[in-house]
């Protein structure tokens, strides 16, 4: 069944993820590792005509997504630049072996918005690498994490792994210009 890291997100867990955001304020959504569209289907059930885009590297899964009318922007999310696109919500369950890279890449390509990401819980609990330490700091500065033991134990594709739901919020920093200070500097 597809690749070794294909673990479709259970609907109940997607519901938990989406409960952390106000979907009424969301305009454009990216699902970077869409699989066969399980997360997308739950989003579609909660929103009227959402603008959802995705990336998916597996050609067979791409065919399934095409059949569901999902817009695929790129195959490999880690090479996706998002140039010309704006996403205010990224929802993902990336391959566990690349979870940190996917989450950090998502953070880098959005200018403002929220990210909901499922990771292997060990990614958070054991920050042995520089990337994991960076992620730990990012969560401390801009987000939160919730742990779900054995969340995929009864899923379509089962695994006893504990997962971490990371919720990050990126706020665009406004440029502040003091007009009076600018005039004072010009006068000098």
Model-predicted regions and their roles:
Residues 1-188:
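Class I S-adenosyl-L-methionine-dependent methyltransferase catalytic core
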């Amino acid at each position: 069944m597809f690749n070794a890291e294909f673990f479709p997100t259970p609907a109940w867990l997607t519901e938990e993820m989406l409960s952390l955001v106000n979907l009424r304020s969301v305009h454009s959504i990216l699902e970077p590792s869409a699989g066969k569209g399980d997360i997308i289907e739950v989003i579609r059930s909660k929103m009227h005509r959402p603008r959802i885009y995705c990336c998916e590297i597996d050609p067979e899964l791409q065919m399934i997504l095409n059949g569901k009318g999902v817009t695929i922007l790129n195959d490999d999310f880690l090479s996706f630049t998002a140039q010309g696109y704006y996403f205010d919500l990224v929802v993902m369950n990336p391959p566990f072996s690349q979870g940190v890279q996917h989450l950090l890449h998502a953070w880098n390509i959005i200018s403002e918005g929220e990210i909901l990401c499922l990771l292997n819980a060990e990614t958070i609990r054991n920050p042995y690498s520089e990337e994991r330490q960076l992620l730990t700091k990012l969560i401390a500065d801009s987000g939160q994490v919730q742990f779900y033991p054995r969340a995929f134990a009864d899923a379509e594709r089962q695994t006893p792994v504990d997962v971490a739901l990371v919720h990050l919020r990126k706020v665009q920093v406004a440029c502040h210009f003091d007009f009076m200070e600018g005039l004072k500097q010009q006068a000098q």
